[in-house]
Amino acid sequence: IFINVKCSSPQQCLKPCKAAFGISAGGKCINGKCKCYP
């Protein structure tokens, strides 16, 4: 699930993904945007 957070590294997506989907969520940075894996 893509969220509206810009990124340049996967680490930048972990906090917003966990905030949106819970502590077990993961995240990747794809094409400059965060993609979360709930």
From Swiss-Prot:
Keywords: Disulfide bond, Ion channel impairing toxin, Neurotoxin, Potassium channel impairing toxin, Secreted, Toxin, Voltage-gated potassium channel impairing toxin. It comes from the Eukaryota. The keyword tRNA-binding does not apply. The record marks 28 as: Basic residue of the functional dyad. The record marks 37 as: Aromatic residue of the functional dyad. One of its GO terms (cellular component) is extracellular region. The keyword Disulfide bond applies. Expressed by the venom gland. It holds the Pfam family Toxin_2. InterPro entries: Scorpion_toxin-like_sf, Scorpion_toxinS_K_inh. It is found in: Secreted. GO terms for molecular function: ion channel inhibitor activity; potassium channel regulator activity; toxin activity. Its main location: secreted. Negative results: does not inhibit the potassium channels Kv1.1/KCNA1, Kv1.4/KCNA4, Kv1.5/KCNA5, Kv2.1/KCNB1, Kv11.1/KCNH2, KCa3.1/KCNN4, KCa1.1/KCNMA1 and the sodium channel Nav1.5/SCN5A. Belongs to the short scorpion toxin superfamily. Potassium channel inhibitor family. Alpha-KTx 02 subfamily. Selective inhibitor of voltage-gated potassium channels, blocks the Kv1.2/KCNA2 (Kd=1.3 nM) and Kv1.3/KCNA3 (Kd=7.2 nM) channels. Association and dissociation rates of the toxin are slower for Kv1.2/KCNA2 than for Kv1.3/KCNA3. Has the structural arrangement of an alpha-helix connected to a beta-sheet by disulfide bonds (CSalpha/beta). This is Potassium channel toxin alpha-KTx 2.13.
